[in-house]
Structures are given as C-alpha cells and as structure tokens.
Amino acid sequence: MAETLSGLGDSGAASAAAVSSAASETGTRRLSDLRVIDLRAELRKRNLTSSGNKSVLMERLKKAIEEEGGNPDEIEVISEGNKKMPKRPSKGKKPEDEGVEDNGLEENSGDGQEDVETSLENLQDMDMMDISVLDEADIDNGSVADCVEEEEEATLPEGLGLLRIGRLQSKGLPEQLQELAIDDKEAINNVDTSSSDFTILQEMEEASLEPENEKILDILGETCKSEPVKEEGSELEQPFAQATSSVGPDRKLAEEEDLFESCGHPEEEEEEEEEEEQEEEQEEEGDLALASSSKSESSSTRCQWSEADALLAVVKREPAEAPGGGTGMDREPVGLEEPVEQSSTAAQLPETTSQELVRAPTAAPSPEPRDSKDDVKKFAFDACNDVPAAPKESSASEGADQKMSSVEDDSDTKRLSREEKGRSSCGRNFWVSGLSSTTRATDLKNLFSRYGKVVGAKVVTNARSPGARCYGFVTMSTAEEATKCINHLHKTELHGKMISVEKAKSEPAGKRVPDRRDGDSKKEKTSTSDRSANLKREEKGDRKDDAKKTDDGSTEKSKDADDQKPGPSERSRTTKSGSRGTERTVVMDKSKGVPVISVKTSGSKERASKSQDRKSVSREKRSVVSFDKVKESRKSRDSESRRERERERSEREQRLQAQWEREERERLEIARERLAFHRHRLERERMERERLERERMHVEQERRREQERIHREREELRRQQELRYEQERRPAVRRPYEVDGRRDDAYWPEAKRAALDDRYHSDFSRQDRFHDFDHRDRGRYPNHSVDRREGSRSMMGDREGQHYPERHGGPERHGRDSRDGWGYGSNKRLSEGRGLPLLPRRDWGEHARRLEDDRAWQGTADGGMMERDQQRWQGGERSMSGHSGPGHMMNRGGMSGRGSFAPGGASRRHVIPRGGMQAGFGGTEPGQQTQ
C-alpha cells in the first residue's frame, strides 16, 4: 500500500495530514519504530521526497524534524486505532525484528537488516506468502488467486476509505458527501477483492446501494436514479490521467494478481516486470496530466476507487454493484475543486448536450441501443440542468502547477530505484520444495546462510487449504551465492524429508511486460502524451470551453473505444473528458425503465482494462502446461502406449492361439481321416479274410465230399468185386449137386427129408457154428463113420424110422443157403452188420488174397464133407472092406489135401479130392453100383 501511495502529489500532502489527524488518534512514537509507510507519510506532510529505502527515509525525516526544531526521538504520528490489522504482514509492514509470524503458515526472516525493496515489492512479497506453489506451476492462474486472505482484502480498502474521509473533511465538503464516503467505504469493505473472484455479496450491495443513490439525488437535485453499471474491461482501456494516489486498491489488486501469477509461474515473472515498467511510465505521464487538477482531488480518488471496484467486479462478470450515479458525480474532477463544484458540473453541461447527442450515435455498437441511449442521455442531462455552479476552479490549477515538478522528480527516482533493484536481484531467488510441515523460515535461513548471505527466506503454503504442502522462497545477496546453495543443497535432507532447490526462473517483483503487449503499451503511451498536451492547453481556457472540450473529447474517445472493442448491446455510449480523463455514461435499466447516469474517470477504466488484459494473459498462461502436467501427460501416454502394447500382444496371442487351434483342428482332422482310412483298410482286410475263410471252408467241404465220393466209389468197386467173385464161386459149388439127380430118387422119403430139413435148419441156425469148428476134431469123423458103417447093415431095416444125427444133414444141407452160411457171403455179412472194415487201397490186394484163401479152404472143406457123405451113403450096404478101398483113401486124401493148397490161394479147380472121388466112383464096378 505504501507503493500505491508513493506517487501522491505534494498538493495532497497537507490534506492527507489533515485527514489522518481528523480520522484517527495521534500518538508519539520513536523514529526508529516508524514503518516505511509512516516515514513516507511524514515526509509527504513536509513536502519532501518519499522515495528510497527505510534508512534513507529515516535520515531524511530526521533532518527535516531537526530543521523544524522538533525532537526526532518523539514524533507525533497517526496511530490508526480503528484500522483492522491483518494477521499476515502486509506490504508496508515487514518488520525487521519479526522472525516468525503468528499464523504459522508463512514466515519472514531477515538478516537483521531492513528489506530494501519498495512498498510495491513488499506487496508482492506479501502476496507471494499467501499462495501455495504445488510443484512449480501446478496451480492455474485462476486458482492461484484464491490464496489471498479475506482479512487483507478488507483491510486495504478500509484504510483507503479512511484516508478518503479525512481528505473530504479537510476540504470542508458537505456532511452528506462525507457520509457518502463512509457508505462507500462500507461498500468497499463488503467487496471480495480476490483477484480470481471479485464477487460482491448481494446483501451488502443492496444495503449500500439504496442510501447512496438517494443521497446523490439529493445533492445533485436530479430526477435520475443511480443504478449499477456493468461494463466490459475492453471498453475501459484508457491510460492513467489522475494523481498517483488515485491508483489505490485497483492498482494493488492488479499487482497482487501479477504476483500470484509470478509466484505460481516463476517463469512468467519477467513478462510482468515489463508490464510494471510500462505502468510506471503511464503513471508518470498521468502525474503530468494532473498537474492542473484541484487540491480536492482526493475526493475524486475515493469515488474512483469505488468505481474501480465495480469495474473489477464487472470484468469477472459477477453481479457486482456500486453506487454508479452518485460516484459518477463525486468522481467528476470539475466538481471536486470545491464542495459545491460537484453539482455545478451538471449545470455546465447543457450547452454541450446537443453536441454530445449528435456525436454519440456514431459510437454506438448497434442501431437499437444507440437510439435508446440517446434518449436516456438527453433525459439525464436535462434533469441535471438545475444544479447550481460554484467558482472554485482556479485553485486546483495553481496547486497542480506548483507541485508538478516534485511529482516528476519523485516518479523518476522511484522508477530508477526499481530498475536497479530489479537488475540486482536477478538470479538471487530460488525455490525450495519438499519441505516438512515443521520447517520454519529461520531453518531455511540457517541452512542457506552457510553458503552466503540470506536476504530473505519465506515459507509459503496455500492459506485456503490447511493441509497444503510447504515451499520455501529464499533470496540470497548475490546470484553466485544462490547458485552455490543450489549446487550444495539440492536433493539433500532437511527435517527428515528430501528437499529440492531450484532457481527461480524470473523474479517475483519484475517490471517487464510480455512481448505481445508491447504494441498496446506504445499506443497507450502515445495517447497519454496527447492527452497531457491537451490538458496543458485546456487549463488556460474557460471552464465552459473546458466542459465542451471534455464532452467532445469523450465522444471521440467513446467512438474509438467502441470501434476497437465493442461491448454488448445494453452498454451505453460513453463520453470521455480528454482533459481530466473522465467518462460520463448514461444507461437505461431495462428492468425498471429508469435512466442511470454514471461518470467515471478514465484512470479507473484504464486499470480495469489492464486487469482484464492481465486476466486474458493469465488465461493464456493457463494454457501453458506445467512440468507436472507434462510429466502426467507423459505418464498417461506411456500408460496408454503400454495398454496399446498389451492390447496388441493380447491380440497377437489370440491370433496365434486361433492359428494354433486351427492347425490343431486340421491335424486332428487329418488324424481322423488317417484313422478312418486305416479302419476301412482293416475292414477290407477282415472281409477279405472272411472271404478266404469261406473259400477255404468251401474247398475243405469239397475235398471232404470228394473223399467221401472216392470212398463210396471204392466201396462200390469192392462190393462189385465181391459180387463178381461170389458169382464166379457159386457155379462151381452147385455143379455137383445139379449133376447129381438123386434128389428125385425114392431113397429120400419125404418125411425123412423134412426131418432132415428141420434138423439142418436148426443145426445151422447158429451163426458161430463155423467159428466153433475145430479142425483138430476131424479125427472123430472116421471113427464115427466107421461106427456107422459097422452098424449100417444091422440097422438097414430100421433106416426108415431113424433120423440122421444133427451134425449130419441131408443132401439139402449142401444147398445154396448152407453154402452161404458156411462161407459168410457178402450179402449175409452186410445184412448182419458184420461187414469188414474199410481198408486202405494198398491193403486191398492182401485182403482179397486172404479172402480167396478162406474161400478156397471152405470150398475144400465142403468138398471133403460131401465126398465123405456120398461115400457113406453109397457104401453103407457094402462090406467093411469097402472102407479100405480106394474111396476111403480118397477121402483121406481129400481131407489132407484141404490144407495142402498153396498160400497164394488155389482155386477149387486144383483140389484133388474131387478127382479122387470121381476116380473112386469110376473104379466101382457097375454091378456094385446098381446093387
């Protein structure tokens, strides 16, 4: 605040002293206990230069008091008892003996020497402690401004309001205007001057708006009702044309915003330095332009502050309200030369009203608002015609002429000192991040004092976030010491935490303007120079002419402003005073239908426009990505690339898996086909084997059938051979009996024949008779036959009644049947089931020979028997001598001859007994035969 008041002209020094004595109590303090702001106030009261550091100011004030004959150790100064002191140090109260602050959030530790920075730099330092730097530039420009505390916001406008009240009282203004100033102060206290919000509480607005409007209407005698004016900062872009004291809270807020941006973004501080340098140049030109202003300019300052607050609220597009009409009249520099001059300005305007109404339509942004605003302006000016005028204009011009040179010298000295300090402090500051919550500024001072002289050490945090991280801002005496501290203490441990020491890229108290604003600054310089020249010329003219020029100039400026940056349709055209930098605006409230007149200074609009420009610049700066955001974006890109790689890898794996599954399916299909082929082949082989087995079985059956057929053929052949042999044998056996005709002889009686038949059949019915026959028993037969021959003669008579023994059959005994039985013919053997077993072919001949032998033996046996019987029957009636005859011998020979045939099997033709028998018969005499 000291810096904002450092440019006050010497013309306002006496009034400032009067205001301070009237508004607050006076106390006695030692010179060494005075603050820089108190020292400068005392110097300004004595019309001395108030620039420089504290030691220079103390020396200068001490000399002045000694020249006046006072005691330098006991100085009567204003003790502002009703002023609310902030909890944190403001810009002008950075005490040298205060090492650690009470709030615990920020601290300031010096090296025992008073800070040599100006009050503006103190303001920036205070703002810097109100913010929190979250990893360099992590906070955007809009949120950084939230670090300002409400106590400080309320303190500065309140103190400035007291100063305005004192100045009004020193000029003897009416009581109504003093009350209005008090109300204005209360309204300002209710304004939230945070550089990010600039919001006004609605209840405070309504409470302060109504009384102020009524008082202004009473003073001015108007029928117009004051309403809040909402204007774009772009419409209000005009250079400074007012006293240095009129910079007030608007300048402070703008600088606070610059400081917030520089603390949040250290790399942007150089641009802000250029901007501040440009403002200083404009301020100097404004001092020249206000050289002819009145001594009561402090009243205009009060009005401009309240208007500037309203403008700042409008810039943020919040529903901020301010006493527009009343402040417009109060802020009119023409009417502030004397208490009654304020209302007389409106009475001087009717002459120029017609010119304003003619020129004003060309500056309107659109046809419809232009017509309505013309009507409103005409109505407002006509309603203000009855206000009386006051003749107090020359005093302000004289006072301004006397103090113009001192203001120029003061501004030059101030600018040079700032430039020198800006150059000397370049590269000395650095940030310390990663601090513990228990780290204090004294700890930082003790730590960095090992490597050089520590000019200042501060611990900052976000006051609105209780748990925010702490950062340190340290200023060394030289850039080399700062570099040494960075090299030695970067990445070291302090209070158990790793700290990072990084050099500040630009100084927070810089004065440079960004390159993109150089063109605007040059234009503002040119326009300010033109207005300064116009002011000097117009001060020599008449007041009415001055009023006309004011109206003309304001109309032209309104045209330029509307052409460059047109506002909304509800904005009214503005008329600017080139001589005093004022602007009169008439608007129509569409909701109430009441015209509103507002007079504003161009300086406040210039500050508002600069604030708007700063906001636009800050919005542009918000687009600048901080290191953390870059790191975060890089991490996000890395994570995205990792996810992309993971997705590609998963897709590739899925493709490989699908390909593997497809190949596996193909392999399985091929294997299934191969198995099916093998199965078909095995099936075919099995069927082939079955077919071959069937064929083999068929061939076997054929072979078996063939063997059976061959066997049957062999059997048939054998049977045929047997039949043939049998047929060949039968005629030879039957021939003797057929030749013999004795059957028909009467020798054989029928009865006897039958009996013999019976005996024969019964005797030979036994099948095993042949087998029981023993050839060794043949010896019995001769005896038997002899016996029979012996008894035959005696028994001849009884022969008819006798029967032959069973073993001697009759002639029929030797029949066919008997032969069959004795010979075991083939028919009999087959019928009895006693056939010979099948013999192999190789045994057939031997069997046939054996069979022939058996048959030959049987034949001989039969032949012998028959011959013996025949001899018995034939020689039964002869004598015994007959037995010894040839017949007996033949019989014996026949019997012996039976076993004398060759083994090869002689036929019956070779049997000798037959011939013997025939020879026997042939040797018989005919007589004996007949007998």
Swiss-Prot record:
**Intracellular or extracellular location(s):** Nucleus
Q: Which UniProt keywords apply?
A: Acetylation, DNA-binding, Isopeptide bond, Methylation, Nucleus, Phosphoprotein, Repressor, RNA-binding, Transcription, Transcription regulation, Ubl conjugation
Can you supply one Gene Ontology CC term for this chain's record? Answer: nucleus
Q: Where is the composition biased (Basic and acidic residues)?
A: 224-233, 368-380, 412-423, 500-573, 581-592, 603-663, 759-820
Q: Where is this motif: Nuclear localization signal?
A: 621-638
In residue numbers, the region (Interaction with POLR2A) covers 550-816
Q: Name one Pfam family in it.
A: RRM_1
> Where is it predominantly found?
nucleus
Modifications made to the protein after synthesis? Phosphorylated by CDC-like kinase 2 (CLK2).
Q: Could you tell me at which residue positions the Glycyl lysine isopeptide (Lys-Gly) (interchain with G-Cter in SUMO1) crosslink is annotated in this chain?
A: 600
Q: What spans are recorded as compositionally biased (Low complexity)?
A: 1-24
What InterPro entries is this protein classified in?
Nucleotide-bd_a/b_plait_sf, RBD_domain_sf, RRM_dom, SAF_Modulators, SAFB1_2_RBD, SAP_dom, SAP_dom_sf
Q: What is this protein called?
A: Scaffold attachment factor B1
Q: Which organism is it from?
A: Rattus norvegicus (Rat)
